């Protein structure tokens, strides 16, 4: 029990430090909590200093993935502002329909749904949120909406990575993974009838939601129906294709004012020409095109960018073995002589491609001056500084909580919760997945971490394995709402300072409601449609 208390205490302390009255910013709280976890390892778990040091170095390498994505997104958004593309898009969207509910659903729901399907890595909020701020919505509230909306598609984000890769270590059959995907989509589809309304409520009142409810559900079902149907036969494309279909349906319905209350257009949006719109949409279109062609494994680019064949290798003394692969994967292996390794996929991580490359292509296209290019670069680097410190703290904490295999702090937390709940595990299963996402920043990592705990709990209690693993995946997705990495990412892209605790206090409520919906769906609705 002492091991459980010491394992969960850092998470409880982190939440307290970030939501108390005079909350600490994440770039202060996370390094302090990471230091505490280090102390627990040394004093209670008797972990050797080499293992701890190796995991700290590994975390510093691993942090390059989220921070370069954040930098790339900031760079792209700063470019969009300075080039005038954001302003043209704002006017164009205002002309499609000035109703704020329509704009929030098109960009915050359907567009983000599609981007999640292509990329994951927190990019939907990073791309969609600045567009909404450009339309005049409050940045802090937009951050909350973006986090809450980006939950339903997450289990099939980055072309299904949380499902097929997240559960890959469990060596499940193809049919079992497909069944897990099917049940996951079913539970998400139920939640999708309620969660977008809670997200909208942050920015508009219930009366406006009621007046526009027909359009809201056209947009929701436009994404969710194809998403659910595709998940019956495939676990890679539900979010990508569902989001694309839903985006088309949402824009079509908004253009015709279907299900929307008439509102006065308060935007300063003189009619923009088709040429201006095409030019303004060019960077975003290029961005999406890069994401899609580099994520679909039927095309050759994904394999090329993930090619692990060694191209260059050298020993860096006691630090470890440094390697560069043909796919430009930079790796440091056997750090300090341990079995700890870390890597950074320069081409595959959505940073250089698509964000930086898109900006480099678009700069001459928009004839941006050298002084403005310098301003874009300098402001992007400055905006990335605090998230970098916060994410080093987060990843050191995560790495150390995973040290010890079956006896790691994370596994102790998971097993203790499972033992306490016993046969009632269906009710709590999704919340374990959410805890995984909260501290790790990823549905995929949550599934990798807790998949084995969920599997053994299901087998011990006699609950359906497919159902429990589906709830794990749903939990990992809903945990995106409160996930530290995503909150840091969207805050930094929108240039919001020291509001992480405020965001968590708002987003944790819909996350808990999501978990309750998942539990009720698993107990009462899933058995009606699935032979468990």
Swiss-Prot record:
Q: Does the keyword Cell membrane apply?
A: yes
Any idea which UniProt keywords this protein has? Cell inner membrane, Cell membrane, Membrane, Transmembrane, Transmembrane helix, Transport
Which residue windows are transmembrane per the record?
23-43, 56-76, 101-121, 129-149, 152-172, 180-200, 213-233, 234-254, 274-294, 346-366, 387-407, 420-440, 462-482, 508-528
Give compartment(s): Cell inner membrane
Q: What is its main location?
A: membrane
Q: How does it sit in the membrane?
A: Multi-pass membrane protein
Q: What Pfam families does the annotation carry? A: Lactate_perm
List the InterPro entries hit by this protein, alphabetically: Lactate_perm
Quote the cellular component terms of the Gene Ontology held in the record.
plasma membrane
Sum up the protein's function in the record's words. May play a role in L-lactate transport.
The family line of this record is: Belongs to the lactate permease family.
Protein name per Swiss-Prot or TrEMBL: Putative L-lactate permease
């Amino acid at each position: 029990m002492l091991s459980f208390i010491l394992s969960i205490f850092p998470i409880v302390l982190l939440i307290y430090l970030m939501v108390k009255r005079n909350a600490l910013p994440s770039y202060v709280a996370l390094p302090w909590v990471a230091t505490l976890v280090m102390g627990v390892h040394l004093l209670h778990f008797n972990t050797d200093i080499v293992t701890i040091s190796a995991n700290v170095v590994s975390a510093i390498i691993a942090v390059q993935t989220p921070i370069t994505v954040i930098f790339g997104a900031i760079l792209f958004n700063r470019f969009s502002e300075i080039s005038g593309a954001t302003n043209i898009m704002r006017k164009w969207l205002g002309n499609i329909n000035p109703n704020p509910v329509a704009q929030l659903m098109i960009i915050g729901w359907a567009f983000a749904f599609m981007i999640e399907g292509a990329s994951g890595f927190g990019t939907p909020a990073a791309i969609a949120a600045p567009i909404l701020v450009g339309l005049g919505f409050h940045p802090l509230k937009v951050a909350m909406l973006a986090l809450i909306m980006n939950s339903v598609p997450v289990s099939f984000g980055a072309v299904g990575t949380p499902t097929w890769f997240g559960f890959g270590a469990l060596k499940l059959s193809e049919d079992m993974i497909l069944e897990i995907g099917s049940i996951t989509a079913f539970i998400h589809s139920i939640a999708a009838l309620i969660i977008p309304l809670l997200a909208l409520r942050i920015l508009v009142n219930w009366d406006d939601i009621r007046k526009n409810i027909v359009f809201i559900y056209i947009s929701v079902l436009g994404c969710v129906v194809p998403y659910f149907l595709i998940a019956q036969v495939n676990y890679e494309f539900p979010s990508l294709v569902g989001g694309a279909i839903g985006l088309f349906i949402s824009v079509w319905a908004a253009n015709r004012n279907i299900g929307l209350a008439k509102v006065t257009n308060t935007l300063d949006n003189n009619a923009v020409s088709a040429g201006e719109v095409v030019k303004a949409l060019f960077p975003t279109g290029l961005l999406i095109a890069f994401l899609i062609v580099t994520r679909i494994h039927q095309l050759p680019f994904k394999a090329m960018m993930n090619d692990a064949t060694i191209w260059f290798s050298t020993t860096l003394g006691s630090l470890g073995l440094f390697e560069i692969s043909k796919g430009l994967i930079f790796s440091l292996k056997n750090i300090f002589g341990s079995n700890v390794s870390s890597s950074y996929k320069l081409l595959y991580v959505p940073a250089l491609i698509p964000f930086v490359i898109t900006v480099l292509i678009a700069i001459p296209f928009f004839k941006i001056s050298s002084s403005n290019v310098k301003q874009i670069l300098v402001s992007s680097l400055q905006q990335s500084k605090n998230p970098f410190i916060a994410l080093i703290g987060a990843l050191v904490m995560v790495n150390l909580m995973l040290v010890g295999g079956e006896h790691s702090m994370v596994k102790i937390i998971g097993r203790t919760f499972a033992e306490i709940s016993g046969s009632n595990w269906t009710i709590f299963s999704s919340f374990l997945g959410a805890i995984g996402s909260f501290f790790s920043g990823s549905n995929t990592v949550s599934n990798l971490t807790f998949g084995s705990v969920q599997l053994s709990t299901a087998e011990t209690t006699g609950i359906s394995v497919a159902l429990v693993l589906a709830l794990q995946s749903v939990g990992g997705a809903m945990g995106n709402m409160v996930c530290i990495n995503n909150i840091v990412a969207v805050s930094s892209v929108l240039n919001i300072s020291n509001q992480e605790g405020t965001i968590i206090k708002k987003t944790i409520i819909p996350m808990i409601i999501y978990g309750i919906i998942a539990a009720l769906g698993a107990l009462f609705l899933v058995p009606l449609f699935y032979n468990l």
